[in-house]
Amino acid sequence: MRNLLLSLAASMAIAAPALAGEARLEARGGVYWEPGNTQATAGAAAGYDADLGTGAFLGGEVSADKVLEANRRTAFGVTGRLGLKPSADSKLFAAGGYTTKNCALCEDAIHAGGGYEQGFGSRLYGKVEYRRYFTKNNAPDGNAVMAGLGLKF
């Protein structure tokens, strides 16, 4: 899995100069919950969004997130984003991807969700996002709501 994530990140870095868009780095935190358990979460993400005309974009990101609870480990993810740009400084998007398991007895997951990103000047942005984690083998599905603060390049 680590090789897949590194390959995707390298591909995004190589393709970035040929695309019209922006790279981004963010720190984020929020709440993760599953039946009977709610915990804080913190993480970081790096991504690239390419413009699809003036009103839409397509992007991808790699991420590392940690549920702040004993016996949890960092979950790594790869996510695609597709969205609209309601204004020059805002993005409304749907997202989906894959996340590694966040504990020894947990399951990896496919995730789907959506969010809103708002620019504050030319480089700073804030973001809120919801994700649903669909697990397998009858493991409980998880949910997360996160807020992030990042820089655009």
Which positions does each model-derived feature cover?
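Gram-negative outer-membrane beta-barrel domains
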Residues: 17-153
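Cleavable N-terminal export/targeting peptides
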Residues: 1-24
